[in-house]
Amino acid sequence: GVDEFSTNAPLVQAVHAFGAGWSEPQLTAAGQLVGSASFQQDAHLANTHTPSAAAHDRWGYRLDEVEYDPSYHRILGAAVAHGAHSSAWAEPRSGAHVARAAMFQLFAQIEPGHACPVSMTYAAVPSLQLSDRLAGEWLPKIFSRSYGSALADETGKSSALIGMAMTEKQGGSDVRAGTTTGVHMGGTSYHVTGHKW
């Protein structure tokens, strides 16, 4: 295998130049992991065996689930275990955002498909912090370094990642074509009209 961190001189220099030199041991360990033959194989498998929709079970009942190859879950689990999704917020200190960005790059450059939920989770934290209720409910799960691939609602999970639903059938990837609306119903309730894919 290859140490994807230590052999990347510009990344090593940037980590030190911008105050995150303290993170070099963690970044080196992650660099060795993502450069290993087994991680590279998982990246290959995750992109060869793409997600598939499971709309209905064998009796015809709606599922609306997405099935992923186990390799994808191993990659996502490793990124979460290394804090690529929230370490800068969970353990704030000088250079923490630089260290997290470097960690994110190490994982995303090998398998970019998992980068979306990892980066969205990182980006969602400041918005969640604006609400004491939401922060109290979600941040402990987001700051967790564990990853559970089982489909369950938030009450049955000790960790969480954040995603977004922007695509609508009439718009495809054109977000401007969205027609879904939300009307505040009081308290923490909204009435949503439309649907997302």
Q: PLM features: residue spans?
A:
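Glycine-rich flavin
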Residues: 68-197
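Extended, charge-enriched "interface" segments that sit outside catalytic cores
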Residues: 1-93, 112
